[in-house]
Curated annotation (Swiss-Prot):
MF (Gene Ontology): DNA binding; structural constituent of chromatin
HAMAP family: IHF_beta
Record text on subunit structure and interactions: Heterodimer of an alpha and a beta chain.
UniProt xrefs under Pfam families: Bac_DNA_binding
GO cellular component: chromosome; cytosol
Name of the protein in its database record: Integration host factor subunit beta
Described purpose of this protein according to its UniProt entry: This protein is one of the two subunits of integration host factor, a specific DNA-binding protein that functions in genetic recombination as well as in transcriptional and translational control.
InterPro entries with a match to the protein in the record: Hist_DNA-bd (IPR000119), Histone-like_DNA-bd_CS (IPR020816), IHF-like_DNA-bd_dom_sf (IPR010992), IHF_beta (IPR005685)
Keyword vocabulary terms for this entry: DNA recombination, DNA-binding, Transcription, Transcription regulation, Translation regulation
Family: Belongs to the bacterial histone-like protein family.
Name of the gene encoding the protein in the UniProt record: ihfB
Amino acid sequence: MIKSELVQRIAEHNPHLYQRDVENIVNAILEEIVAALARGDRVELRGFGAFSVKHRPARAGRNPRTGEHVPVEQKSVPFFKTGKEMRERLNRDNGISAETGA
C-alpha cells in the first residue's frame, strides 16, 4: 500500500471528510514523526509500534565492483519496532502462535 491508497481508504471509511483533508492530516502526522526523529526523539504509537533513530558507527566498506576498501561514514538510520498488539494480530491473522512462533 502506498500513501495515496492509505489516504483513499481513510477517506472511504470517513465520508464526512474530504480526501484532500485526509491527505493533509496524513502528511501532517508523517511530518511530525520525521521532525521528532530529526530531534532525536522516540515516537511511540501504543499498540502499533515505536519509531526511533539508531546510529551506525563509521566502518570500512568494500566496493563490490573493484574490491577496493572504502571508508563508510557514521550515519543515523530510522528504526521501527512493532508493538505487541500489532505482532499478535499479524501472527493471529497468519495462523502463527505468538508464543511459539510456529
